[in-house]
Amino acid sequence: MAKMIAFDEDARRGLERGMNTLADAVKVTLGPKGRNVVLEKKWGAPTITNDGVSIAKEIELEDPWEKIGAELVKEVAKKTDDVAGDGTTTATVLAQALVREGLRNVAAGASPIALKRGIEKATEAIAEQLLKSAKEIETKDQIAATAAISAGDRQIGELIAEAMDKVGKEGVITVEESNTFGLELELTEGMRFDKGYISPYFVTDSERMEASLDDPYILLLSSKISNVKDLLPLLEKVMQANKPLLIISEDVEGEALATLVVNKIRGTFKSVAVKAPGFGDRRKAMLQDMAILTGGQVISEEVGLKLESADLSLLGRARKVVVTKDETTIVEGAGDDEQIAGRVNEIRAEIERSDSDYDREKLQERLAKLAGGVAVIKAGAATEVELKERKHRIEDAVRNAKAAVEEGVLAGGGVALLQATVAAFDGLKLEGDEATGANSVRLAVEAPLKQIAVNAGLEGGVVAEKVKNLTPGHGLNAATGEYEDLLAAGIIDPAKVTRSALQNAASIAALFLTTEAVVADKPEKEAAGAAAGADPMGGMGGMM
């Protein structure tokens, strides 16, 4: 395919036009009085959202240069969303302001490389200042406040704070759609996985269709069980101990399954067989997690253990196990705390090494099942459009709250960024074009606060000047129009969100400024007369 090439100012201005188109659509959502954006979908109802990254992903521009510019800014929003879960609109607004200031300086003859260095040094100094001034999250109310700001809803904030309080910071909080109106919180004790009983004959409570085992032994096996002779020696030992048995294996079938079912129906021996979750290496890892949690061992020929020679010392224990047709929950496994902590650290290290979003998510789930717990927030709404929008807001707010616990919180409303810059620039000694680049950052950090003010119907420049002269932590509460102590008023942002937004915006701005040529695909022209030469009767012209 033929390519088009643009150089110098033409290249940079083309990219800037694309960036401005995208940023202008996104920035109307910023702040408590920000508006929503409606996104058309090819199928189903349109989506209404105020989430920066969701809006950015939907924007596709026709002009090749503008398209590339928009894609670069999408990357800012996406990276900020991946790292911090929020702050995507702030990052987009910052990127737009940084590029605008930087291009003005490049056009005036400044060295793009020196500007880039100045931007990077200023960004690093501000990021350090942000972390220095961050306040650690100490109360449930602070978590509720930061989540409520992200979701724009106090009730959502309180529910997330309660969920985090119950499952801990390692726990997983998932959001599901509910058929009922409103919000519900469902908590899971212990480890839960998505596999139920192999046969409904294992049920102990026919009304609820679940099997409940108190103080059971737990057999963990990496292979199938079909031959009852392999299982019998172990079954006899468990029966002598007068305890129920939970079997988690690749599968239980044939005469082995029939034997377990017959003994359960006769009341001779209480047991439940469940398929192990996952596939391949992930299944092995999850079985090992369960072994450590319950204080047992995975019986596998790989480690020289055979089912026929297994004894009770290889089995895990738990206070209770509840199995439904779809899921199994192990409550209070009898594993050694030190071993569990070691396994948790192993999984954490794997999460840091992994570069796949999917793998990271699965590892995070495993971590939660071992170290914390699982909370499910069920959201309902009057219409499908509102439900999707609400679910998305809750997911963002959950990640926002986790970011707040990680690095602490700052005054919200764009104030912390502005005030941290004033402090950071006191010790920054730069000269020439590097100083010009740093100055671009100093001017650009006002953009989020100005945009919040504009969306609230106020004059952005006037608000920014006033906030610069206030005590650190004091600023504009855009919801009320009052200037006050934002931390005390519960208007807070996670330091991780603010820092990530600035660093990602600066990274893309530096790329914009140092771009000297852009290569894009040349749009293909439709073949002349292709449509005109087509047979209007589709090749059936002779038929009457």
Swiss-Prot record:
Tell me, what does this protein do in biology? Together with its co-chaperonin GroES, plays an essential role in assisting protein folding. The GroEL-GroES system forms a nano-cage that allows encapsulation of the non-native substrate proteins and provides a physical environment optimized to promote and accelerate protein folding.
- List of residues binding ATP: 29-32, 86-90, 413, 477-479, 493
Q: Where in the cell is it found?
A: Cytoplasm
Please provide, in alphabetical order, the Gene Ontology terms of the cellular component aspect for this entry.
Answer: cytoplasm
PANTHER family tied to this protein: 60 KDA HEAT SHOCK PROTEIN, MITOCHONDRIAL
What family, per the record?
Answer: Belongs to the chaperonin (HSP60) family.
Q: Name one GO molecular function term.
A: ATP binding
InterPro entries attached to this UniProt entry: Chaperonin_Cpn60_CS, Cpn60/GroEL, Cpn60/GroEL/TCP-1, GroEL-like_apical_dom_sf, GROEL-like_equatorial_sf, TCP-1-like_intermed_sf
Keywords in alphabetical order: ATP-binding, Chaperone, Cytoplasm, Isomerase, Nucleotide-binding
The catalytic activity of this protein is classed by the Enzyme Commission as 5.6.1.7
Q: Which reaction does it catalyse?
A: ATP + H2O + a folded polypeptide = ADP + phosphate + an unfolded polypeptide
Describe the subunit structure: Forms a cylinder of 14 subunits composed of two heptameric rings stacked back-to-back. Interacts with the co-chaperonin GroES.
* Gene field: groEL1
Main EC class the enzyme belongs to: isomerase
Does Cytoplasm count among this protein's keywords?
yes
Asked if the keyword Cytoplasm belongs to this entry, the reply reads: yes
Gene3D superfamilies from the UniProt entry: GroEL (3.50.7.10), GroEL-like equatorial domain (1.10.560.10), TCP-1-like chaperonin intermediate domain (3.30.260.10)
What is the protein's major site of localization? cytoplasm
Protein name as it appears in the record: Chaperonin GroEL 1
Q: Which GO BP terms sit in this record?
A: protein refolding
Query: Which superkingdom?
Result: Bacteria
Species this protein is from: Saccharopolyspora erythraea (strain ATCC 11635 / DSM 40517 / JCM 4748 / NBRC 13426 / NCIMB 8594 / NRRL 2338)
